[in-house]
Amino acid sequence: VDRPTRTNEKALAINLDMGRYGSFAEIGAGQEVARWFYRVGGAAGTIAKSVSAYDKTVSDAIYGPTRRYVVRERLEEMLRYEQSLTLERLFPQRGDSTAFFTFANTVQARSYQGNNECHGWIGVKFQSHPRDEDSQIILHVRMLDSENQAQQEALGIIGVNLLYGAFFLYHRPDELVESLLDELSIERIEIDMIEFSGIEFRHVDNRIMSLRLVQLGLTPAAMFSASGKVLQPSEVLRKRPVLLERGRFSPVTRVNLDMIDKARAQFADDGGAAVQADDIVSVMEITMSNLRADQGEVDLTDFIGRAEVLGVTDHIVMISDYFEYYRLAAYLRRYTDRRCAIVMGAGALRQIFDERYYARLEGGILEALGRLFKNDLHIFVYPQKDPETGTLWTVETLEVPKDVRHLYGYLVERGFLIPVEDYDESVLDIQAPEVLEKLQSGDEAWESMVDERVAEVIKARKLFGYGAR
């Protein structure tokens, strides 16, 4: 790496860059980022002001009233307010030679009782060059250290990393993301959302940046909306019922959509007062193992194709590194105490009962299924035709290995495995590999196998190799 990785070196490099000058506004865990710049010397060349409005009344007087303080909206208002104030006060005398910036964070660190969720929003709004339009990077972190002091230290380091990245790596966003955990580890900080915006990042696709977070191990899962806007998982899933479908989605077929639509309707009906249809968060999940090609690399063009077709279906997209369903279930439970359900085809359900997948677990398949179904999680099982024989697999007819038949029967009996009832029989013959093969070979039959909106976007943007032959 031809750049500094140590925090003090980065802070000093920024202090010695006379062309950058700005403000620090930090709430919730001390002035941990500004402190680095004071500590290494030369801060007068960088810091116009550092402020911490700890009192809520004082904070509201500066940034406007709010109900919640550790949220994205508060961070963005802090960045907007402080940057405009800096420009108003300092632009007339040094605007021609100075690129101004504002760093801000709003954080909930470990409390005195020590039982709260520790997380925060961190951001920088900056000019790359004097008189430039602003660019911005914001991120959400979970702080995993058990001691308050260690959390403060980690926050200071990631803040310096973000500022160094914004000033010196803005033209290499991949490297910028990778550098955020210099001198930190994923045991200390998880970054579950990052968003680039503004003039310098007009060509950055935030969906790819979300993918990078998971790819680099900075978070186990990242989300974006149908329109491609990055989402912070707890703000989406918090206290909501969740329905999730996992798939390859290359492309998303009529079967995929019938699965989630019919399961959603049934979820709302079966859930009674506990599950309102409008309240359900529908998520289409792609795992990293489904994204990696044969060589273990992720094809970005293929990834964007999948994101584009999922976008027109109006579902939230999640990229995760959870191969095992029981780990996925634990992740959802981190954010919501409402009912959660996964919908899958009968073929995928059979794999869940394959004991080979659980060889690493001390308690084997029993432990895995115990973890999966605890806390009121259910699986909706969509019927699937055997491509060889044409036999229809359902909850009732699925053949699982002899050793686990009683276990399977128990889960059916207890209502953990629920058959999807009102399915569309006309889509059962659609096989995803066949759709892709027809699409790439120029056989127009593929169009009837996907939703009209999906077909339109594939043809318009020539996704998945359409029109190549």
Q: How would you describe each model-predicted region?
A:
Residues V1-R469:
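Nucleotidyltransferase catalytic core that binds NTPs
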